[in-house]
Each structure stands twice: as C-alpha cells, then as structure tokens.
Amino acid sequence: MLSNMHFLCGGRIVWGEITQTMYRAAGGEEHEPDGLASEMRGMTGVEVSILIHEIPEGGLRAGFRSKGLFDVSRIAVELGGGGHVNASGCYVKGDYEAIKKNLLEISVRHMGE
C-alpha cells in the first residue's frame, strides 16, 4: 500500500487506495491496516492524508486525516459524510473511478481556498 501513494498540491495532500483487487490478493479481508491513514499524515510536508477503499457494491468509503491546519470535514461533508477538523470520512455508492476523481478534485479545491 505505501508504494501506491500519490501526492497532490505540491505534496500537501497524500492519498492512497485499497481496491477490491488488492483485498482479494490479501485474502479477501476488507479492513484498513491499523494506523495507515495516520502514518500517511505523518509524512514530511503532508497536511492531509486520504485513504480510499473501493467497496464491493460499487463506490467507495474514504477516510480523511489532517494535522489540524486544514479542516478535512469540509471535504467529507461535500461528499455526504462528516466528522471533525482532524478526522472525517464518507461513504459514496456509484462508479468507483468517477467518485474517486470527484473526491480528489474536491480535496484539491478545498486545499486551495
């Protein structure tokens, strides 16, 4: 998973995804490795981490973490989720790739505000 991370906004956002293919390769268990989102957030220069999980019924669930400099609940709320400044999340059904693209665009837009 850590080799599959991507950076946006000059490294201020780091995001990774766990797809259904990855779940199957790991034996079919759908769980987030303990502390992965927090570990991602702890990287130098990163203000926000996003961990995206593809869900079997189509769509995704995502967790957002912040060091407190950015209110990640704003991203989650726009996607129908919730949370607080440092930790929030959302669950969205539909086309995985389209939702992921929208989520990342929203994240970049909010980071620029």
Language model segments and positions:
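Hydrophobic helix-and-loop "lid/oligomerization" segment in the mid-to-C-terminal part
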Residues: 1-79, 83-113
